[in-house]
C-alpha cells in the first residue's frame, strides 16, 4: 500500500502540472471502489479550477473552485492504485476507473484491487478535515508538532509492541510497514519492545529516525514493492536502500547480526537480533 512517502512523491509530481488547471471533463468507468465514486462528480467538476494539491496522511486532496464555490476531491490510492498523466490518444486499460480531462492531457486513476477512494467534500479547504475519512487521522510525522515529548506522552499507556503502535493512523499517519521497520532499525529499538517500555531518551532517538527515514524515502521516490509508480510512470527505489526490510536471514549491515523476519498484527516485521533491543 502506498504510504506517506509515496503519496507525498505523488503530490509533488502532480502539483506542477495540475495546480491552476481547469478540469475539462470527468470520466467514471467503474464507480465501485472501496466507496462508490459519486456520479455527481461528472457534472460537478468540469469547469472547476484546481487551486492546490495537498496531502493529509495517505490521502491526496485536490482543492477546487468554480465561481466562488469550493470543494475538495479526496483521493486514496488504496492497496494498488496510481495516478498518471497520459495523452488523449492512450486507450484506457482494464483497471483505469476514473479520469480528469485537462488541457492537453488526462489524469488517470488506475486501481486493480479497487481499495482506492475518490470522494468529494464540499466547502473551503479546511472543511476536508471534517470528512469522516480524515476526521480521526493522527498527527503528521513530518510536522513540527511531532516531537519526542509528544510521542512519549501519547504512547505512555500503550502496552502493545512499539512497531504496530507506530503504524496506528489514529496516532501518527503514514508510517507504513516498511518505514516502521526501518525507523526502528535506525533507532536501535526492537519492534517487540512494549511501547510504554521505551524510555524518553530513546524516543529522542526514534523521532529523528522516523523523520529521516520518511524524508530519505521521499527523496528516493518512495518504495515500489508491488504496484506503486509515480505520476510519470517511474518507480521508487527506497527499498534498495533498506537496512532490514526484506532482508530476512541476511547479515545486518550495521553489526553483522542476523536479520530476522516475524509477523506482527498480520504484517511482516524485519529487525536485527544483534543491535535492536
From Swiss-Prot:
GO MF: 8-oxo-7,8-dihydroguanine DNA N-glycosylase activity; class I DNA-(apurinic or apyrimidinic site) endonuclease activity; damaged DNA binding; zinc ion binding
Binding-site positions, DNA: 95, 113, 158
Family matches, as PROSITE patterns: FPG_CAT, ZF_FPG_1, ZF_FPG_2
Catalytic activity: Hydrolysis of DNA containing ring-opened 7-methylguanine residues, releasing 2,6-diamino-4-hydroxy-5-(N-methyl)formamidopyrimidine; 2'-deoxyribonucleotide-(2'-deoxyribose 5'-phosphate)-2'-deoxyribonucleotide-DNA = a 3'-end 2'-deoxyribonucleotide-(2,3-dehydro-2,3-deoxyribose 5'-phosphate)-DNA + a 5'-end 5'-phospho-2'-deoxyribonucleoside-DNA + H(+)
ZnF FPG-type: positions: 243-277
Electron transport found in the keyword field: no
Residue ranges of the TM segments: none
Cofactor annotation comment: Binds 1 zinc ion per subunit.
Summary of the function given for this chain in its UniProt record: Involved in base excision repair of DNA damaged by oxidation or by mutagenic agents. Acts as a DNA glycosylase that recognizes and removes damaged bases. Has a preference for oxidized purines, such as 7,8-dihydro-8-oxoguanine (8-oxoG). Has AP (apurinic/apyrimidinic) lyase activity and introduces nicks in the DNA strand. Cleaves the DNA backbone by beta-delta elimination to generate a single-strand break at the site of the removed base with both 3'- and 5'-phosphates.
Self-association state and partner proteins as the record states: Monomer.
UniProt protein name: Formamidopyrimidine-DNA glycosylase
Phylogenetic placement of the source organism: Bacteria, Pseudomonadati, Pseudomonadota, Betaproteobacteria, Rhodocyclales
Amino acid at each position: 500500500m502506498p504510504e506517506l512517502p509515496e503519496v507525498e512523491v505523488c503530490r509533488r509530481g502532480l502539483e506542477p502540472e495540475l495546480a491552476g488547471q481547469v478540469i475539462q471533463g470527468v470520466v467514471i468507468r467503474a464507480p465501485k471502489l472501496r466507496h462508490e465514486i459519486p456520479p455527481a462528480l461528472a457534472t460537478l467538476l468540469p469547469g472547476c479550477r484546481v487551486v492546490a494539491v495537498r496531502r493529509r496522511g495517505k490521502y491526496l486532496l485536490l482543492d477546487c473552485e468554480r465561481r466562488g464555490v469550493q470543494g475538495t476531491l479526496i483521493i486514496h490510492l488504496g492497496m494498488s492504485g496510481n495516478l498518471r498523466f497520459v495523452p488523449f490518444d492512450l486507450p484506457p486499460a482494464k483497471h483505469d476507473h476514473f479520469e480528469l480531462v485537462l488541457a492537453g492531457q488526462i489524469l488517470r486513476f488506475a486501481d486493480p484491487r479497487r481499495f482506492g477512494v475518490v470522494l468529494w467534500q464540499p466547502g473551503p479547504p479546511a472543511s476536508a478535515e471534517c470528512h469522516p475519512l480524515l476526521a480521526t487521522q493522527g498527527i503528521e510525522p513530518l510536522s513540527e508538532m511531532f516531537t519526542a515529548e509528544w510521542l512519549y506522552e501519547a504512547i505512555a499507556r500503550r502496552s502493545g509492541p512499539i512497531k504496530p503502535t507506530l503504524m496506528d493512523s489514529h496516532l501518527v499517519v503514514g508510517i507504513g510497514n516498511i518505514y516502521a521497520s526501518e525507523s526502528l532499525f535506525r533507532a536501535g529499538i526492537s519492534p517487540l519492545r512494549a511501547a510504554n517500555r521505551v524510555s524518553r531518551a530513546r524516543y529522542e532517538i526514534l523521532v529523528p529516525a522516523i523523520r529521516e527515514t520518511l524524508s530519505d524515502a521521499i527523496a528516493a521516490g518512495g518504495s515500489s514493492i508491488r504496484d506503486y509508480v509515480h505520476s510519470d510512470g517511474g518507480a521508487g527505489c527506497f527499498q534498495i536502500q533498506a537496512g532490514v526490510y526484506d532482508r530476512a536471514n541476511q547479515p545486518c549491515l550495521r553489526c553483522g547480526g542476523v536479520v530476522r523476519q516475524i509477523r506482527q498484527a498480520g504484517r511482516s516485521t524485519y529487525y536485527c537480533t544483534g543491535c535492536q533491543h
